[in-house]
């Protein structure tokens, strides 16, 4: 996503993310095993923890495709500004599966401006149509789906996030 931050602001933001991840004392969440096909195609972001980077973003998505090596994933994250018909904002990153060949559930993504996020897959639905990921400290959580979910399905997703130990009152559900 294209942001208007000066160089010092970007550096400060990157340092805060790194320090926040390193300094947090937390119980490491359990991950599940996912196949390599998990990192193919487009997932819709139907729920997320609010953060500065996604302010004003609706109709969010993440598109994955294979990188140069088996453990590398090329990522495009995007959203529309303010309404689903709004201006498209995108950012590209390069992901590395940190536990390649075992669970394939821990991915570190490097974005521009030295911003790095860790995404761990905590749950994937039996029909593989949606999943929940979080950072290792469980301070940020995302719910993704291949399609816009019904209200009932969204409630199941939220309940699952709660079962995993996340305070779902912190989640926001942007317009699709």
What are these regions (language model features)?
Residues 11-21:
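Bacterial N-terminal signal peptides
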Residues 2-12:
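Bacterial N-terminal signal peptides that target proteins for export
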Residues 22-176:
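A beta-rich soluble binding module of mature secreted/lumenal proteins
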């Amino acid at each position: 996503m294209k942001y208007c931050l000066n160089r010092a602001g970007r550096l400060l933001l990157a340092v805060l993310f790194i320090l926040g991840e390193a300094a947090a004392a937390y119980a490491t969440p359990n991950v599940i095993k996912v196949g390599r096909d998990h990192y193919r195609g487009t997932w819709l972001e139907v729920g997320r923890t609010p953060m500065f980077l996604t302010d004003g973003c609706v109709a969010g998505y993440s598109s994955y495709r294979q990188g140069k090596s088996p453990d590398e994933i090329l990522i495009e994250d995007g959203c529309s500004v303010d309404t689903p018909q709004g201006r498209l904002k995108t950012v590209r990153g390069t992901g590395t599966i940190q536990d390649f060949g075992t669970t394939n559930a821990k991915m570190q993504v490097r974005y521009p401006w030295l911003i790095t996020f860790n995404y761990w897959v905590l749950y994937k639905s039996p029909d593989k149509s949606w999943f929940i990921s979080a950072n290792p400290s469980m301070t940020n959580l995302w719910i993704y789906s291949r399609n816009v979910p019904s209200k009932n399905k969204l409630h199941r997703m939220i309940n699952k996030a709660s079962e995993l130990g996340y305070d779902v009152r912190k989640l926001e559900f942007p317009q699709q």
